[in-house]
Each structure stands twice: as C-alpha cells, then as structure tokens.
Amino acid sequence: MIDTTAPLSLLEALVLGIVQGLTEFLPISSTAHLRVVPALLGWDDPGVSVTAAIQLGSVAAVIAYFRRDLTQVLTGISRAVRHGQWRDPDARLGVAMVIGTLPILVLGLGIKFFWHAGYASSPLRSVPSIAIVSIVMALFLAMAECMGPRLKQLGGVTGRDGFVVGLAQALAVIPGVSRSGSTLTASLFDGWNRADAARFSFLLGIPAISIAGLVELKSALSTSAGAGPLPLLVGIFSAAVVSWLAIDWLLRFLQRNSTWIFVGYRLVFGAGLLVWWAFKSAN
C-alpha cells in the first residue's frame, strides 16, 4: 500500500521526474532527493511506490542509451549457451549483470513482502538519517578515489566483479546510500577505471530498477491516495528525458575528471540537511 496522504499533482510529478532523472545515475542518491525535495517544498512524502514507479523512466533511458551494449550482451550469452563460449567478453558481462542483480533482488523482495509497511515509515527514511548516510557514503567515495588503481576495464569483467559490485548495490535499499554511488565506490575500490565503473553501474542497474518499478507500479496506481495514471506518466516521461541527459553527461565527465565534485556535493548536502532539520526541529 502506498504511503502518501494526498494524490500526486502534475506539478509534483514533473518535479519528481526531473529530480529522479538528475539523481538516479549521478552518485548522489535519487531516493534521498526524492524524499528531501518534497519535504523542502512542503509537499507530502511521495512514498516508496510512487518513487519506484517513476524510476521506470530512468530504466527506459538507460535501455535506450545502452541498446547496442545490451544487444551485444544478449548475443554473447546466446553464443555461450549454444557453443560454450563463456569466455566471450559480452557473455561474461551478461553473467556479471545476473550475479550482481541477485543480492538486491533478494533483499528488495524480502523488504517488499515482509517489511514493506515498516520500511515505508522507517527511521531510515527520515531526514537526519538520510543526511548522515550521505556524509558517510561521501567519505567512502573519497577513500575509493584515493586508493583505487584504475586498471580494470569492462571487457575483463568477471562473475566475481559482478558479485562484489552487486553487494554494494544492495546497500541502496538504505535511503541516502545511492545505488550508482555505492556501485561506483565499490568498483573504484576494486580497481576499475572511472568511466567503465560508471558504465557497469548503469548496466547493472537495469534489472534492479526495472523490477522495483514494475513491482510498485500497480500499488502506485491502485490506491485511493495514489498518483493516478496521468501524473505517473508525466513523472516517468520527465525522468526518462533527464536521465538520458544525465547518463551522457556523466560518462563524458568521468573520462576526464574524478569524482571529487560528488564527494563535495554529498558532504554539503548532508551537512545542509542536518542544519535544516535542526533549525526546523527547534521551531
């Protein structure tokens, strides 16, 4: 059941879609911003179901952007199944994506079916929790930026790489962690170059975000306080357009630059939230 108290307006859906598109693939946590931006604007929390459904726009964008990569992965897996060519780079990438999806799939479905109501109202979704998590993850990203050797490339990905990065992806069920941030951090710690780390993060997110969005879409549409089809379509469409632009920008950016700008942003974001929350609580 969706955890909002009022239907979503078209303006709210548009803003949430833009926020989703900007933050899903940047290592700054879309879940945190989708929780915090409505709070700052005085809107109701859109809830787990609506935010997950709007993520389908990001799924459409990443599938469209990486359509050639995905076609090659499917072709590689097909060759491996038919001819046993499991050392093929495209087949290995497909296997890594499957293995990397399992941790968040198990954890996410467990939360959905056994702790959904508790998770939706959990202290993990509170502003101070999101702020603290954002600061902690910024520090981990900073350490990864300093320590990683930057030698691994996507063509050499293994099932072990998929599992390691997949475990990091599972941490994204905690608001403020950032799915792209946790996977990028784990990849950098594991020795990937920045651009390929981001590319694998995007590809790995396709199954996880797709499943989460489809599972929650019915709930977002079916409850009396839900968003309704038109606002959801507005949110999904705006998320798709902005996500495409964000993916393209980040891949180009990381070919020439480090992730320090995101470390700084997350530190300022987290500290600013704590100050805002303290001021609001005092009044």
From Swiss-Prot:
Enzyme class: hydrolase
Keywords, comma-separated and alphabetical: Antibiotic resistance, Cell inner membrane, Cell membrane, Cell shape, Cell wall biogenesis/degradation, Hydrolase, Membrane, Peptidoglycan synthesis, Transmembrane, Transmembrane helix
Origin: domain of life: Bacteria
Statement: the UniProt record of this protein carries the keyword Chaperone: no
Enzyme Commission number(s) of this protein: 3.6.1.27
Disulfide bonds: none
Localization annotation: Cell inner membrane
Transmembrane segments: 46-66, 95-115, 127-147, 154-174, 200-220, 227-247, 259-279
GO MF term list: undecaprenyl-diphosphatase activity
One Pfam family per UniProt: BacA
InterPro entries cross-referenced by the UniProt entry: UppP
Protein topology in the membrane: Multi-pass membrane protein
Biological process (GO), any one: cell wall organization
Catalytic reaction list: di-trans,octa-cis-undecaprenyl diphosphate + H2O = di-trans,octa-cis-undecaprenyl phosphate + phosphate + H(+)
Gene Ontology CC entries for this record: plasma membrane
Function recorded in the entry: Catalyzes the dephosphorylation of undecaprenyl diphosphate (UPP). Confers resistance to bacitracin.
Additional observations: Bacitracin is thought to be involved in the inhibition of peptidoglycan synthesis by sequestering undecaprenyl diphosphate, thereby reducing the pool of lipid carrier available.
Family: Belongs to the UppP family.
Protein name: Undecaprenyl-diphosphatase
Source species: Synechococcus sp. (strain CC9902)
Gene this protein is translated from: uppP
